[in-house]
Design a protein with these regions (language model features):
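N-terminal secretory signal peptides
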Residues: 1-16, 26
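N-terminal export leaders
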Residues: 16-35
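RNA pseudouridine synthases
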Residues: 188-190
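Acidic-aromatic/histidine active-site loop/patch
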Residues: 192-208
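C-terminal segment of N-terminal export signals and the immediately downstream linker at the start
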Residues: 34-72
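A short N-terminal beta->alpha junction/helix N-cap motif
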Residues: 12, 54, 91-94
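Histidine- and aromatic-enriched segments that form or immediately flank copper-ligand environments
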Residues: 59-186
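Short, glycine/acidic-enriched capping/hinge loops at junctions between secondary-structure elements
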Residues: 3-4, 8, 76-80, 206
């Protein structure tokens, strides 16, 4: 028996089915459109990007340039600034093969804040791990950091910012390392699925 329990006082109303579907349709969408209620200074500071839909790009070169910046995102019908990589949310999928050596040039285009990328679960030298204050100083505004490392393992991982609440604001992506030897089985198609949540609030304010 299914019983519907009415929300208590002060409860946040659930979005309508229509709004939920609109949010799903916008998955991975970064929109450069103005919205009522968004401060004009925020709109001016954010990068005006075209509407992007579908899965993020897959980057598999061993030399890759990544630009961390601010774009406008709309998942719920409201627009707010997000932290993106190459204008994409989620960030591009990075896909390599075990045994390769990769060079990533990560440029910080944020005007006021440092940033970083941590390669979650990857075996790395300390100065390539990407944790500010622990393994390096972070990437200041206008700076570029050169990550250089050998891939000594295979598996499915992810990468994300370790600076402030940038991960919660959109700076995360999938990292796939295929084994050195081809898989002993066939498959028709492969899908990379990332689960995350989203808030229209400033993540820093949400965690206070």
């Amino acid at each position: 028996m299914n019983t519907r329990i009415p929300p208590g006082p002060g409860a946040v109303p659930m979005p309508s089915r229509r709004l939920f579907v609109q949010g799903l349709a916008a998955g991975g969408v970064v929109a450069g459109i103005a919205a009522v209620g968004v401060p004009q200074r925020a709109l001016a500071a954010a990068t005006a990007a075209p509407r992007l839909a579908g899965a993020p790009a897959v980057l598999s070169d061993t030399r890759i340039e990544l630009a961390i910046g601010e774009s406008l995102a709309n998942f719920t019908g409201r627009t707010r600034p997000a932290i993106t990589v190459n204008g994409s949310l989620p960030a591009p999928i990075l896909r390599w093969r075990e045994g390769q050596t990769v060079d990533l040039f990560v440029r910080n285009t944020l005007e006021r804040h440092p940033t970083s990328i941590h390669w979650h679960g990857i075996l790395l030298p300390a100065n390539m791990d990407g944790v500010p204050g622990l393994s390096f100083n972070g990437i200041g505004p206008g700076e570029t950091y050169h990550y250089h490392f050998e891939l000594k393992q295979s598996g499915t991982y992810w990468y994300h910012s370790h600076s402030m609440f940038q991960e919660q604001a959109g700076l995360y992506g999938a990292l796939i390392i295929d084994p050195a030897e081809p898989a002993p089985y066939r498959h028709d198609r492969e899908h990379v699925i990332m689960l995350s949540d989203w808030t229209d609030m400033d993540p820093g304010a949400l965690f206070r």
